[in-house]
Amino acid sequence: MNINNIKIRNSKINDIEKILEIEHSSFARNICEDKQVFIDRINTFNKGFLVAEYDNEVIGYICSEIWIYDENLKESSFLLNHSIKEAHKNNGNELYISSFAVLPKFRKFGIGKILFNYLTDNINKLIKNPKSILLVVAENWSSARSIYINKGFQEVCILNSFFDYADIEPFKANGIVMRKLL
């Protein structure tokens, strides 16, 4: 695979089936978000919903929302399938990365890093005077957590039993909310 042939672009509605394929191949069923949630994300904040293409195939995505920075985070803000229509604020100052995945066969090539860096490096085009970037990562995803820590993110709170793996094994992982101040 030639990483130089990766194209990053804004998502389109006709990408939805491929986005869902990536979602379902990347996460346990109880963690996957609904089709309508992704459609709403595309329609509400298309500039913050990027896809990676390789040979004209969508192989990864990252989507985000703009929130108003709040020191006192509410667990309800992070619910799976929450409505971007209610959470997204065009006048906000915090970028929340709501979902991020790459097809399994294309992992380990740096595609996730390309998507993540493209979104975060262009934050000033998305938000006027950005204050921070926020995301949630499963406690058991230690390699992802270390990547975020190396990029300057800090753990700010724990969402108990946030990730439900019941369709794979009887296990729930805590979600770690991480924030990077800009």
Model-derived segments and spans:
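Conserved beta-strand-loop-alpha-helix junction that forms the acyl-donor binding cleft
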Residues: 107, 133-145, 161-173
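Conserved GNAT acetyl-CoA-binding A-motif
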Residues: 95, 123-138
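Conserved active-site alpha-helix within GNAT-family acetyltransferase domains
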Residues: 113, 125, 139-158
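Active-site rim helix/loop that mediates acceptor-substrate recognition in acyltransferases
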Residues: 29-54, 58-69, 82-86
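A short beta-loop-alpha structural element at the N-terminal edge
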Residues: 5-19
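Conserved acyl-donor/pantetheine-binding loop and adjacent beta-alpha core of acyl/acetyltransferases
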Residues: 63-99, 160-171
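Glycine-rich phosphate/pyrophosphate-binding loop shared by adenosine-nucleotide-utilizing enzymes
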Residues: 6, 57-61, 95
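Conserved acetyl-CoA-binding loop-helix of GNAT-fold acetyltransferases
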Residues: 102, 108-123, 150
